[in-house]
Amino acid sequence: MSYYGSSYRIVNVDSKYPGYPPEHAIAEKRRARRRLLHKDGSCNVYFKHIFGEWGSYMVDIFTTLVDTKWRHMFVIFSLSYILSWLIFGSIFWLIAFHHGDLLSDPDITPCVDNVHSFTAAFLFSLETQTTIGYGYRCVTEECSVAVLTVILQSILSCIINTFIIGAALAKMATARKRAQTIRFSYFALIGMRDGKLCLMWRIGDFRPNHVVEGTVRAQLLRYSEDSEGRMTMAFKDLKLVNDQIILVTPVTIVHEIDHESPLYALDRKAVAKDNFEILVTFIYTGDSTGTSHQSRSSYIPREILWGHRFHDVLEVKRKYYKVNCLQFEGSVEVYAPFCSAKQLDWKDQQLNNLEKTSPARGSCNSDTNTRRRSFSAVAVVSSCENPEETVLSPQDECKEMPYQKALLTLNRISMESQM
């Protein structure tokens, strides 16, 4: 069982790398990395000692109610009604007490009929705000203060209903629930694609009503620590091949690791040891509501598999296309050099220069059949891992011409065979 579990068995083509290097696990234990984004898209950020925290929440009370949790929402919903009933019930009881209605004197016309205790005043307040109207208790024309209190309670009840019910409906229709149906692959992969080293991950929408259009964005967040122990974070955008997508079927997002990529100089070992996080966001519009949504996820080095590619999930049938969701997370090991994209470009440039200079050295062609050697992908990998090689003399270079030609041919065939 490998470091990533039994579902992702690691197989390399070079015997000196029997599995993922142990420094991958050692580096992970050495540093307790805390990610900025969890896999579900929630931010791992805690704010403390915010200036004017409660004041800012109360100014935008509607957004505060929408963002709060459902259990807190239920408590606020219940307390808003119960407290308003108690407050206005107390006011009606004070009016009755001041007017002498609690004495039950038949010569006194009460402000509110049949209110002779606090319980009766509370029930009258509840009936007024909820417009139940049993008819046993009612306000009279004797006290203008009681009439004004009924008017204020009716207005306040409309305001409470607007905020509480509106916030509850907005919370149920929030975009976060729709974002949970957008799924990112748990692992990101690095492998060869069209002859280039690429970083890939997969996005899928598993609802019947698919998104209309969407934009994918990726950023590399690198953590660094200065001499004083202060942590700094630097963001850099990753250029994507397919950033504008229609998510009808699962799509593999591709980032070519070229000279503009922050991963350009990182080989397999460097990726395992580095301290970075890849933040991916998907902003899209739903076809059922027409509202904008956003889904997020992230990948850290231990969630990046080197030398893998995703399984195909799309099957072509006679009348429709079939998506096999069981293969969404599946990947298979493929050939990928252990060196960085920078070293690959350097080696490709050297081989291209060798091809250009080979016609001018016809004396070397007569010696092509004298030396026959077997080549494998290990030779390509080994040559990529040592970009700084000694310069050969013209005589030795002529002798190595068959080897270099075979190496060039094998390198291109190996890359094309993965497509």
From Swiss-Prot:
GO cellular component: basolateral plasma membrane; monoatomic ion channel complex; plasma membrane
Superkingdom of origin organism: Eukaryota
Extracellular side: 95-117, 135-143
Tissues expressing the protein: Abundantly expressed in the proximal and distal segments of the nephron.
A Pfam family per the record: IRK_C
Role in the control of polyamine-mediated channel gating and in the blocking by intracellular magnesium, annotated site positions: N161
Modification Phosphoserine occurs at: S358, S374, S376
Short motif Selectivity filter, span: 131-136
UniProt cross-references to Gene3D superfamilies, sorted A to Z: 1.10.287.70, G protein-activated inward rectifier potassium channel 1
Membrane-embedded but not crossing: residue ranges: 118-134
Name of this chain's protein: Inward rectifier potassium channel 16
Species in which this protein is naturally found: Mus musculus (Mouse)
Lineage: Eukaryota, Metazoa, Chordata, Craniata, Vertebrata
